[in-house]
Amino acid sequence: MRLTALPAFADNYIWTLIADDGTAVVVDPGDAAPVLALADQGLRVDTILLTHHHDDHIGGVPALQARFPGVRVIAPVEERIPTATGRVGEGERVQALGRTFHVLSVPGHTRSHIAFHTAEHLFSGDSLFSLGCGRLFEGTPSQLLASMRKLGTLPAQLLLCCAHEYTVSNAVFARHVDPANAALWQRQEEALAMRRDDRSTLPVTLANEFDCNPFLRVHAAPIRASVSAHLGRDVVDDVDVMAGLRHWKDGFRA
């Protein structure tokens, strides 16, 4: 089994798991072209997994359905994804390529956002990024906190496969919030070196994210202190920290 991140648009990744026989699971194909280029070399798409309804994640589905009639399209319970052939929610499982993809409900970025994880990988869409998380378009800080806590219980060895190359820009904000975090400094330097060489900063272990990502560490004293200082008052609880942290990030300029 081979994991490939297909670049799309300015900074998207279309994650593709490819079996030895060329059969594939494709995650969030906002653009069909990168997948169709592999199809011209023999790739056969068996299953498409969709994390949420935004067009840069689902826009390529009709063209892939035309190329691969009968392909499964698994999506959240969401009326804004009309191309879905199956809909799943929290605790359900998808079987594909001999692997089990566990479904997690992770609202925040959108109200119906889901993630998929196997024994090796977490496909988080726009819920969790390396060193960051998705902007709140439809969800609440309380929902975002619950989603981050849920992702924070996953095995540390899982590889985070998120949908955007935001690591370097996220690192600047994370360092501003948590400047004494040595692991974060190291992750930033590694990410900068990777991007200078035009390499992806992903996947990355959840263990690294647990150490470095401020949105997974709202309970930690340094994060709480930074958010309190930014707000000019003591934070009340973890929801207050998450709300302040997300709002801070939304308006942050390095």
From Swiss-Prot:
Function in brief: Thiolesterase that catalyzes the hydrolysis of S-D-lactoyl-glutathione to form glutathione and D-lactic acid.
Binding note for cofactor: Binds 2 Zn(2+) ions per subunit.
Keywords: Hydrolase, Metal-binding, Zinc
Binding site for Zn(2+) 1: H52, H54, H109, D126
Protein's name in the database: Hydroxyacylglutathione hydrolase
GO term, biological process aspect, one: methylglyoxal catabolic process to D-lactate via S-lactoyl-glutathione
Annotated InterPro entries: Clx_II_MBL, Glyoxalase_II_hydrolase, HAGH_C, Hydroxyacylglutathione_Hdrlase, Metallo-B-lactamas, RibonucZ/Hydroxyglut_hydro
SMART domains: Lactamase_B (SM00849)
Cofactor(s) of this protein: Zn(2+)
Pathway of action: Secondary metabolite metabolism; methylglyoxal degradation; (R)-lactate from methylglyoxal: step 2/2
Pfam family, one: HAGH_C
Listed GO MF terms: hydroxyacylglutathione hydrolase activity; metal ion binding
